[in-house]
A protein has these predicted regions:
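Metal-cofactor-binding active-site regions of metalloenzymes
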Residues: 1-194
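Conserved small/polar residues in nucleotide/adenosyl-binding loops
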Residues: 197-198
């Protein structure tokens, strides 16, 4: 039994890297509830406990349902900062020294939130993490698989204004019926713009 605890202790103390984290998916029930009140966004939950109960999902699509409910409460730059900063505090607790964060601009642009608002909130928290805790990071932008490829080109264009912050692009959201081949031209364009493709 002591060996088990010493192994867990060793793992907790060891420096770690998190290479695949979707920042919107890290939204905790408490922050979702708080932001829904602050931004006057209705969510289908009356309490933090109801949100927490909804987090017991059985597959990707059931996870995406709660994921998109959460994205709706993110409106202001400060919301994206708070979302990212809460994640960073968990990184510090788990001794994560480097993280690569994915984000979904299309989830927010469709609601009228500007690209600049999204990226600046996330980036500001990551810069503070480096300064305060020495946690390094990279940002990867994702395109939503369930949307048409054509709609992604405008998002890629907006990302060009933030080349200093975004190191690459990828895909996320519902995989069923949405293979990577659907985005062939988009990824060719991204590679021409010197974006890494993941």
């Amino acid at each position: 039994m002591n060996n088990l605890y010493s192994n867990i202790d060793f793992i907790k103390k060891s420096p770690k890297t998190e290479l695949h984290l979707h920042i919107e998916g890290s939204l905790e029930p408490e922050l979702m509830f708080k932001l829904s009140k602050k931004n006057k966004i209705e969510i289908p939950f009356k309490t933090v406990e109801e949100i927490r109960s909804a987090y017991s999902f059985s597959n990707l699509d059931s996870f995406l349902k709660i994921y998109y409910e959460g994205t709706n409460v993110l409106i202001q730059e400060e919301d994206f900062f708070d979302l990212t900063w809460e994640y960073i505090l968990r990184c510090k607790q788990d001794n994560i020294v480097h993280t690569e964060i994915f984000f979904d601009p299309q989830s927010h642009l469709s609601r009228g939130v500007s690209f600049k608002t999204i990226i600046n909130g996330i980036d500001r928290a990551l810069k503070k993490a480096e300064k305060d805790f020495g946690i390094s990071s990279k940002i990867i932008m994702c395109f939503l698989r369930h949307l048409e490829e054509e709609s992604c080109f405008e998002v890629l264009k907006q990302a060009c204004d933030h080349k200093d912050k975004i190191i690459g692009v990828g895909l996320d959201s519902s995989e069923k019926g949405n293979p990577p081949a659907k985005f062939k031209r988009l990824f060719e364009r991204a590679m021409k713009d010197r974006k890494s493709v993941v």
